[in-house]
């Protein structure tokens, strides 16, 4: 990105180049934004820049506000998309600008679920662990960002809840999906890690030679496998033995 204080000079230089055509201003102030003020502050700064460029004879046609509306992972209360658009439109009255938004996370995050099964329960003097068959290579956000993901048993059971750390089978201290969750669990239980639709598969890896998970699209009462699980043979397919 370009510092907004340097932007006028950069646009002026671009305007001098015959093979460049200036059409817009774009910004990206972050992701998982859960309040309107940061968006509106960025918008005001961009509008001031657009007005300054106009005095230099540079006409801006489109405005990309970038960033992304946040979603509710836990107790966040992000603004509604309609409120966001209304606030932006109010500030753009009388301006002939094509608007571009990047709402990816808000569209897909809460539409995705990572399903994982409890393989073992491990009780120690200090902590209880639920070892599941998913791992940080499948969903790295908790390990990478300390992200909080809601975990729900697919079939709830009665019993005394215990506080579990949900960990995967990878030999890494950071291999966890959730920590300190009050759950009633038994080996074999299926768990849903919710809000996994954004930055899930796209950030997954083959660490520890683990094939990436299959993806299933659910439409009403129908389910379709839209990406099959990777096989071990596929992971080795790109490798070659050294010559004899």
What function would you assign to each model-found segment?
Residues 1-62, 71-76, 87:
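Active-site-proximal beta-alpha core segment in soluble small-molecule metabolic enzymes
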Residues 1-4, 8, 40, 78, ...:
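Electropositive phosphate-/nucleotide-binding environments in soluble metabolic enzymes
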Residues 8, 31, 37, 73-77, ...:
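Residue-level recognition of conserved structural "scaffold" positions that shape functional pockets
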Residues 27-34, 63-70, 104-106, 135-137, ...:
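Active-site beta-loop-alpha junctions enriched in small/polar residues
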Residues 35-41, 72-84, 109-120, 179-181:
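Short glycine/threonine-rich loop-to-helix capping motif typified by GTGT followed
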Residues 87, 96-244:
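Charged (often Lys/Glu-rich) extended helix/loop segments that serve as interaction or gating elements
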């Amino acid at each position: 990105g370009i510092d907004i204080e340097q932007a006028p000079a950069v646009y002026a230089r671009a305007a001098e180049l015959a093979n460049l055509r200036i059409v817009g201003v774009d910004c990206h102030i972050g992701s998982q934004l859960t309040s309107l003020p940061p968006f509106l502050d960025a918008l005001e700064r961009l509008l001031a820049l657009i007005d300054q460029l106009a005095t230099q004879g540079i006409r801006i046609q489109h405005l990309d506000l970038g960033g992304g509306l946040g979603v509710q992972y836990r107790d966040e209360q992000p603004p509604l998309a309609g409120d966001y658009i209304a606030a932006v439109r109010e500030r753009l009255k009388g301006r002939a600008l094509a608007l571009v938004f990047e709402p990816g996370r808000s569209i897909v995050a809460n539409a995705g679920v990572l399903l994982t099964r409890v393989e073992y329960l491990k009780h120690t003097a200090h902590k209880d662990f639920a070892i599941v068959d998913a791992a940080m290579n499948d969903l790295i956000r908790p390990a990478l960002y300390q992200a909080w993901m809601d975990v729900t048993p697919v079939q709830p059971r009665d019993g005394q809840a215990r506080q579990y750390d949900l960990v995967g089978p990878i030999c890494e201290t950071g291999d966890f999906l959730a920590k300190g969750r009050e759950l009633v669990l038994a080996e074999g239980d299926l768990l849903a890690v919710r809000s996994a639709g954004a930055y899930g598969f796209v950030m997954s890896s083959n660490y520890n030679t683990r094939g990436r998970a299959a993806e299933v699209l659910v439409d009403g009462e129908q389910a379709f496998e839209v990406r099959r699980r990777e096989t071990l043979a596929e992971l080795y397919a790109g490798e070659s033995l050294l010559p004899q």
